Regions:
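Intrinsically disordered, low-complexity, compositionally biased regions/tails
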Residues: 15, 37, 57, 84-87, ...
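Amphipathic alpha-helical binding modules
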Residues: 72-118
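Generic detector of well-ordered alpha-helical segments enriched in charged/polar residues
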Residues: 16, 20, 24-27, 48, ...
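Amphipathic alpha-helical interaction modules
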Residues: 26-81
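Short terminal alpha-helical segments
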Residues: 2-49, 109-115
Length: 118
């Protein structure tokens, strides 16, 4: 049985490049003020994994959007509730990604199955 993935049209936007750019800026800003801790290592691993996934991505489909959402949720948890302290530059880069994520990813994301609001 062949499964066809729905490719999501985003008009003129190059979502993969925009995501790669904003996450790379976040990674660069975070690396400047990096203080080793368990949450900081998780955050850096999360950044590296997402950038690796974006390098492999060829098109914008729901799988990519779900990976971006997973990245966002994990990073948001580490920043908001974890012990991760961002310097001012990294915090501003995070806010820029946060804004971009809500503007681009959230409206296009299609979640299948039951949803639980936290």
């Amino acid at each position: 049985m062949e499964v066809k993935r729905k490719v999501i049209s985003m008009g003129e936007r190059d979502v993969i490049q925009e995501a790669r750019t904003t996450i790379t800026l976040l990674q660069t800003a975070f690396s400047k003020g990096f203080t080793p801790s368990l949450d900081a290592l998780r955050f850096r691993e999360n950044l590296d994994q997402m950038l690796k996934g974006l390098r492999k991505a060829r098109r914008v489909d729901n799988r990519l959007l779900m990976e971006l959402e997973k990245f966002y949720q994990t990073a948001s948890l580490l920043i908001g509730l974890g012990g991760l302290a961002l310097n001012e530059e990294a915090f501003q880069a995070w806010r820029a990604y946060d804004h971009w994520h809500y503007e681009v990813v959230k409206p296009q994301l299609q979640v299948y199955g039951p949803m639980v609001l936290l």
